[in-house]
Amino acid sequence: MKLNPGDEISFNDIVGEISEATGFKNATVIVGGEYETGIGGGICQVSTTLYNSLILSDLEIVERHNHSRPINYVDLGTDAAVARGYKDLKFKNNTNNPIIILTEADGQKLDFKVLGNSADRDYQVKIIPERLGVVSPDVKTTYSDSIPEGETVVKESGKNGYSYKTYKEVVKNGEVVEKKEISKSYYVPKSKVLVVGTGSSSKSNDDDEDNNSKSSKSSKSSKKSKDSKDSKKSKDSKDSKKSKGKKKS
């Protein structure tokens, strides 16, 4: 892709329609702050890779958005989320000469190369993300009668959110000659969800039944033992009388 000086490009316009008909597959997407499967999942890895190449080439970023949730394939503060209609990556050729952006992919790896006149860029750029803070998740509580009263189940453990400020450092002849803020990013925390039980304790009822069953068995056993003793006593008495009767005769 060639850009003349001053040309502005929209990532979404270049990609076009995201659908099965245009070759996109199902993968993980973030919708309303939640992870789910959708057509075109993973497209943000492409926009993020391009974004980092643009920053390192010191091209002008017109529009960029971070993801609503933390992602794990690049440093936080260096991602570029896209979503047709409300999130785009736009950039401009702010050099004095045409530039060419090349894309190389082999099925496992994607590379972007920005080619231009070396006279426009006689320095290097470094990307420096800086974490400003950690935001703890709030706690949401729901109730369920399918869980015994007094018990609490953690339905979702929750995740921290983060705020970042990202800088670019311009390095010339081994020295930092400029440090400039290029973006701010905020990643929303994911709530911790607890389910509090309001139902009856089935375990307690089971224990009562077990105890009643035990008592019944114990009583029955005791009765049998008593009957056995009475029977033995009666037999002993009978044998004793019989023996005495024989002796007398």
Give residue spans per PLM region.
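Well-ordered beta-sheet/strand-loop patches within structured domains
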Residues: M1-S249
